[in-house]
Amino acid sequence: MNEAAPAFPDASVSDCMAVAELLGRAPKTAFTVVVRSADGTPVVTRNAPLERDGTPMPTRYWLLPSSRASQAIGRIESMGGVRAVELVVDPTDLARAHSAYAADRDAAMPAGWTGPRATGGVGGTRLGTKCLHAHYAYFLAGGDDPVGRWVFAQLALHERDIPVRGVESHASVS
């Protein structure tokens, strides 16, 4: 029998307001902020595996769109970053990251849930790389993601501000 809403720790009221402002809409799923900027602004959310209406949510870790990292990653993607990373990342390591991501999302499913479930790994992808933002969010949240590591290295090479795990720090690169 399906439960109506997932059991998942909701964010604080202030986090809900901040995330809604960053998204430009109300969040569709319960979430917890797992990475913040140095000033406390939410950067990455860990999302419940189901939206509030029971629709599967494949994206467990979400890099919020207004972060400096998100904008820089958009530039990397527009310059062919997805193709570039697929040429250098070991497919076995990437498959492991997809499996670990899916296992993390599946472990958060409500007990007894028999309705639809999200499939795939990072961002719902089964193979390869779909979205550098999703891989980077997972990496920042502590996931062992080779694509997220690659994105981190690209940001370190090309951006003055380097987002790091746990806190989006703004360290200068010489």
Task: List the predicted regions and their residue ranges.
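Short N-terminal edge-element motif at the start of the domain
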Residues: M1-N47, D53
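An exposed acidic His-Trp-rich patch
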Residues: R68-A118
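Intrinsic low-complexity, intrinsically disordered or marginally ordered coil/linker segments
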Residues: M1-V13, A72-I73, M79-E86, T119, ...
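Conserved aromatic-histidine-acidic binding/catalytic patches
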Residues: R25, D53-M57, P116-G124
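Polar/charged alpha-helical tracts
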Residues: S14-E21, T92, A103, A107, ...
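Aromatic- and glycine-enriched beta-alpha-beta binding-site module
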Residues: V34-L87
